[in-house]
């Protein structure tokens, strides 16, 4: 899709558009705002005078750059979405993301927190190395690290991707109804170490556990953005999940 290129809008153009929005909170939509550190830091300096709050997405490696974190926080960043993907190093290695080091996750999150920003983690379930224990292990880590928000997804082999080609060759594609390929409501392939039903139930359980009131309370105590950012977002997620029938009792947990 991106043809292996990073494209930039001029910093001044982004800052003008940013300043033109009347709202206090802005989502800066960039798949990895830390992809070009020089550009990112120049952008943060340009955003600082406008006094708004913003969030965006970054790689875990952004947490290693103190200047990046300091400038982001000073410019109004309140949350970074970090694609952790998995708390299993074997699963990360499987999908060529060995550069994500699970043993460095907790420290990276701690560094982001130290600069007054919260973390939203992106998690995927269903890798070949995932066992039924992955749901509890993920929940335990996210709570212990004080992750403020999490977005969970079911691994989905979209048509045209190498993953779909491999699973199709292995006879593991279960349906070609593309409307079910949404990463949330259906498991469209045969997982290696559990049934499709177990994967779907585990995904639902992970959501329900993370956004339970007890988990919210425990994680809130570690949040640098507590009441004005973390609590409203968690309660909104919790309400939406309950509305859609995600609760621990329903999953037998």
Explain the meaning of each model-derived region:
Residues 1-120, 125-127, 131-136, 140:
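Radical SAM [4Fe-4S] cluster-binding motif and immediate context
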Residues 171-253:
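Radical SAM enzyme core and accessory elements
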Residues 38, 90, 94-95, 125-133, ...:
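Flexible glycine/acidic-rich beta-alpha junction loops that bind and position SAM and/or redox cofactors
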Residues 21, 141, 145, 209:
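Short alpha-helical functional segments enriched in proximate histidine and acidic residues
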Residues 107, 162, 197-201:
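Generic recognition of short, well-ordered alpha-helical interface segments
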Residues 56-63, 85-92, 112-118, 150-158, ...:
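Short, surface-exposed, charge-dense and proline/glycine-enriched linear segments
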Residues 54, 98, 138, 168, ...:
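Alpha-helix boundary/capping detector
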């Amino acid at each position: 899709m991106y043809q292996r290129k990073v494209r930039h809008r001029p910093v001044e153009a982004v800052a003008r558009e940013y300043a033109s929005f009347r709202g206090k909170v802005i989502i800066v939509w960039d798949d990895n705002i830390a992809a070009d550190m020089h550009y990112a830091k120049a952008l943060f300096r340009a955003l600082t005078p406008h006094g708004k709050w913003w969030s965006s997405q970054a790689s875990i490696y952004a947490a290693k750059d103190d200047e990046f974190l300091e400038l982001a926080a000073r410019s109004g960043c309140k949350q970074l979405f970090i694609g952790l993907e998995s708390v299993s190093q074997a699963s990360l290695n499987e999908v060529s993301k060995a550069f994500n080091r699970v043993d460095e996750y907790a420290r990276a999150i701690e560094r982001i927190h130290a600069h007054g920003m919260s973390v939203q983690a992106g998690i995927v379930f269903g890798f070949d190395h995932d066992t039924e224990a992955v749901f509890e292990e993920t929940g335990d880590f996210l709570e212990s690290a004080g992750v403020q928000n999490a977005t969970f997804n079911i691994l989905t082999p979209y048509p045209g991707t190498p993953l779909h080609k491999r699973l199709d060759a292995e006879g593991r594609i279960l349906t070609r109804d593309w409307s079910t390929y949404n990463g949330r409501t259906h498991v469209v392939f045969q997982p290696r170490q559990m049934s499709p039903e177990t994967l779907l139930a585990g995904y639902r359980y992970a959501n329900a556990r993370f956004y339970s009131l007890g988990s919210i309370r425990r994680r809130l105590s570690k949040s640098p953005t507590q009441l004005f950012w973390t609590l409203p977002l968690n309660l909104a997620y919790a309400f939406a999940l309950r509305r859609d029938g995600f609760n621990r009792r329903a999953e037998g947990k």
